[in-house]
């Protein structure tokens, strides 16, 4: 297992959940957190603890977004019309690294971030190497021609463990994806339950 995989699965162990639904997650074999004290029985969490855990889980899912970035996204979500929790999910799903992952151009969120940073992705025909780039409805995302035969791309196409959600229209022959609409929480194919309303409560304290 690579260092990147170890870091990724450490999030699973800390949460005690297989948050990406990966078959190789160590949580499939044990139900305690990382480290020598991971097997200690956990007590009941306080309301604050439950809210914090919900925030850590969602941050971890989106490739461990920094607190500064995550809070900035939350603030933007509160300024939009509608439910702040739903808005938060919509903004996270508009991140370019999320769309690349959802489109099955790569196998993990972490790989999506690296793939973009290395210049393998175009948006509307122009190279974009910023993983936090905000995709708009109607944008077309594509893998660069020279990158389409990379092993990481070919492997991701074969993954049976997840499907492309219906708010992204993908052509894997051309390696293109069109972002069709901003999803609601219920549209997003999370492997575990996400609770953005608890994150709103956390930041509203």
From Swiss-Prot:
Record-linked InterPro entries: Ribosomal_uS4, Ribosomal_uS4_bac-type, Ribosomal_uS4_CS, Ribosomal_uS4_N, S4_RNA-bd, S4_RNA-bd_sf
One GO term of the biological process aspect: translation
Record keywords: Ribonucleoprotein, Ribosomal protein, RNA-binding, rRNA-binding
Similarity comment: family membership: Belongs to the universal ribosomal protein uS4 family.
Disulfide feature: none
Annotated protein name in UniProt: Small ribosomal subunit protein uS4
Assembly and interaction partners: Part of the 30S ribosomal subunit. Contacts protein S5. The interaction surface between S4 and S5 is involved in control of translational fidelity.
Domain S4 RNA-binding: 94-157
Biological role: One of the primary rRNA binding proteins, it binds directly to 16S rRNA where it nucleates assembly of the body of the 30S subunit.
A single MF term (Gene Ontology): structural constituent of ribosome
GO cellular component assignments: small ribosomal subunit
Pfam families from the UniProt entry: Ribosomal_S4, S4
Top-level taxon in the UniProt lineage: Bacteria
Region feature (Disordered): 18-46
């Amino acid at each position: 297992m690579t260092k990147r995989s170890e870091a990724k699965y450490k999030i699973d162990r800390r949460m005690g959940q297989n948050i990406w639904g990966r078959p190789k997650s160590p949580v499939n074999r044990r139900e305690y957190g990382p480290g020598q004290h991971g097997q200690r029985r956990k007590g009941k969490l306080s309301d604050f603890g439950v809210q914090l855990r919900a925030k850590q889980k969602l941050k971890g899912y989106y490739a461990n977004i920094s607190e500064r970035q995550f809070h900035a996204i939350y603030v933007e979500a509160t300024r939009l019309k509608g439910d702040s929790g739903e808005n938060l999910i919509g903004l996270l799903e508009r991140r370019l690294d999320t769309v690349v992952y959802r489109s099955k151009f790569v196998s993990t969120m972490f790989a999506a971030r690296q793939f973009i940073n290395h210049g393998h992705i175009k948006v509307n025909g122009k190279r974009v190497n910023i993983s936090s780039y905000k995709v708009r409805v109607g944008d077309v995302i594509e893998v660069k021609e020279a990158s389409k035969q990379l092993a990481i791309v070919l492997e991701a196409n074969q993954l049976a463990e997840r499907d492309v959600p219906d708010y992204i229209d993908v052509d894997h022959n051309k390696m293109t994806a069109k972002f069709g609409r901003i999803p609601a929480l219920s549209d997003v194919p999370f492997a575990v339950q996400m609770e953005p309303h608890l994150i709103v409560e956390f930041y509203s304290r």
